[in-house]
Curated annotation (Swiss-Prot):
Component of the signal peptidase complex (SPC) composed of a catalytic subunit SEC11 and three accessory subunits SPC1, SPC2 and SPC3. The complex induces a local thinning of the ER membrane which is used to measure the length of the signal peptide (SP) h-region of protein substrates. This ensures the selectivity of the complex towards h-regions shorter than 18-20 amino acids. SPC associates with the translocon complex. It comes from Leptosphaeria maculans (strain JN3 / isolate v23.1.3 / race Av1-4-5-6-7-8). This is Signal peptidase complex catalytic subunit SEC11. The gene is SEC11. The keyword Ion transport does not apply. It comes from the Eukaryota. The C-terminal short (CTS) helix is essential for catalytic activity. It may be accommodated as a transmembrane helix in the thinned membrane environment of the complex, similarly to the signal peptide in the complex substrates.
Length: 173
């Protein structure tokens, strides 16, 4: 008995399980990085030019969230309440620390003004513990550009997923 494209059912099942193994391995690696870095998003892609020349659009950033004592000049990734896209900017001022919660003011290197306009409506600073996803500890230039292309061209995502599915089904062991 032959299945999809002349494959035996056992071969087809093996291919599907192989594909599931690849996906689950990637997921486990992501979760492992999240635990080690103490960050919900241990890797992010720069989506705009607001941090040029330090980081270009498409750079892949690695985050670390273990040290809660963020200094002025440090580059952090933060989430704004009510928005789902993380922002990568430099800390330009800090308030508090010690017994009082650490509050931060950020600004993009390529921006004229600080980020108070980007923060949530009732927010004039970031709370380190609640808003900051992590501090940038390393990067790989332009590797994340694939992510930008896929988000700006949704049809490319479907084509890539289709090609990956076809490759898994047609691959012979």
């Amino acid at each position: 008995m032959l299945g999809v494209s002349g494959m035996q059912p056992r071969q087809l099942a093996a291919q599907i399980l192989n594909f599931a193994l690849v996906l689950s391995t990637a997921f486990m690696m992501w979760k492992g990085l999240s635990v080690v870095s103490d960050s919900s998003s241990p890797i992010v892609v720069v989506l705009s030019g607001s941090m040029e020349p330090a980081f270009q659009r498409g750079d892949l950033l690695f985050l670390w969230n273990r040290g809660l004592d963020t200094q002025v000049g440090e580059i952090v990734v933060y989430n704004v309440k009510g928005k789902d896209i993380p922002i990568v900017h430099r800390v330009v001022r800090r308030y508090g620390g010690g017994k009082t919660p650490l509050r931060l003011l950020t600004k993009g290197d390529n921006n004229i003004a600080d980020d108070t306009e980007l923060y949530a409506t009732s927010q004039s600073f970031l709370t380190r513990k609640e808003d900051v996803v992590g501090s940038v500890v390393g990067f790989i230039p332009f590797v994340g550009y694939v992510t930008i292309l896929l988000s700006e061209n949704p049809w490319m995502k479907q084509v890539m997923l289709g090609l990956m599915g076809v490759m898994v089904v047609l691959q012979r062991e």
